[in-house]
């Protein structure tokens, strides 16, 4: 009786919410928030948070793994930035703050080669005008560059802005072995895109140097035009990490 009931319930469940294996489809159809993708027409009240028709979630995410041996110095540098301007990280608090998690090393080819701390920062990005700088734009850019360039942080492969992936593949000792395996298993490049070719260093470049490229994370500024000079944001050295080049609001 119990087995029959379970079979009946399973069959009913599959007919309602499951269409069978394999589970293949567009990413926006695989990942959902409850039933928001298939909800009734109700003025978009139950739309998914990422639905472009509504003013839903829209932000940048910087997610980087800092080697455990460098974490103390990295945090102290961030503290030094906050000491200069205590309000500089308030934008992070509007979202999730700074999420931190421990990760261990792995034998995988594109692995964390040593124990590390993952830092996840979620912050504002204008939906209407992608070239609009954020409040305290320079502080966020400096933290990002500090982690990548000074402390040799590794980017989360599924997050981050373009500049985080510039040269990232070279930080992995077994990158060439991975690429050989990739070529052997996928010689036709069916699982490759222009973007994956760029971040794996196979073709093209992830950075795009043009007017206004820095606020969008397409480049590290080297000229005022890469920021938003018409809105007072100029390319300047970092405040703590002097080698950084960030878009700073110049008021005088």
Swiss-Prot record:
Among the Pfam families in the record, one is GULLO2-like_3rd
Q: What pathway is this protein said to act in by its record?
A: Cofactor biosynthesis; L-ascorbate biosynthesis
EC number of this enzyme: 1.1.3.8
> Which reaction does this chain catalyze?
L-gulono-1,4-lactone + O2 = L-ascorbate + H2O2 + H(+)
MF terms (GO), sorted A to Z: D-arabinono-1,4-lactone oxidase activity; L-gulonolactone oxidase activity
Q: Where in the cell is it found?
A: Mitochondrion
Where it mainly occurs, coarsely classed, is mitochondrion
Sorted alphabetically, which keywords does the UniProt record give?
Ascorbate biosynthesis, Mitochondrion, Oxidoreductase, Transit peptide
What biological-process terms (Gene Ontology) are attached?
L-ascorbic acid biosynthetic process
Q: Which InterPro entries match?
A: ALO_C (IPR007173), FAD-linked_Oxidoreductases_BP (IPR050432), GULLO2-like_C (IPR055154), GULO_Plant (IPR010030)
**Transit peptide region:** 1-102
A Gene Ontology cellular component where this protein is annotated is: membrane
Q: What does this protein do?
A: May be involved in the biosynthesis of ascorbic acid.
Task: Tell me which family the UniProt entry assigns to this protein.
Answer: Belongs to the oxygen-dependent FAD-linked oxidoreductase family.
Notes concerning its domains = Lacks an FAD-binding domain present in all the other members of the family.
User: What's this protein's name?
Assistant: Probable truncated L-gulonolactone oxidase 7, mitochondrial
Organism field: Arabidopsis thaliana (Mouse-ear cress)
